[in-house]
Design a protein with these regions (language model features):
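N-terminal alpha/beta PP-like core and its mobile active-site loop of ThDP/TPP-dependent enzymes
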Residues: 1-110
């Protein structure tokens, strides 16, 4: 079991049933780990605002925690408005943001 699989197993054990995702290449291990979890459903969104808004709505309507999976800092920036709304509404939401591989850090990519 790798770290991504352990994280997804922990989320499932905590009652998380859905992950709203807009992943990039840096989150592929997490995507693969979600795919292995029979208890978690992955929903792909084509924009981070859609992903975070859907997770907020899901959490408000079901009173169950949802997970978002976003791509790097720009992905987080695109989803921040809805994450702010979710926080203000006390929506049960867990946000995961990927990061560059260590060997890519020297390029200082966004």
């Amino acid at each position: 079991m790798n770290g991504a699989e352990a994280l997804m197993q922990t989320l499932c054990d905590g009652g998380v049933e859905v992950c709203f995702a807009n992943p990039g290449t840096s989150e592929m291990q997490l995507v693969a780990a979600i795919d292995k979890q029979k208890k978690m459903r992955a929903i792909l969104g084509l924009f981070e605002g859609v992903v975070t808004g859907a997770a907020d709505g899901y959490g408000r309507m079901t009173d169950k925690p949802a997970v978002t999976l976003l791509h790097l800092g720009p992905g987080l920036a695109n989803g921040l408005a809805n994450l702010h709304n979710a926080k203000r509404a006390r929506t049960p939401l867990i946000n995961i943001v990927g990061d560059h591989a260590v060997d890519h850090l020297k390029y200082n990519a966004p």
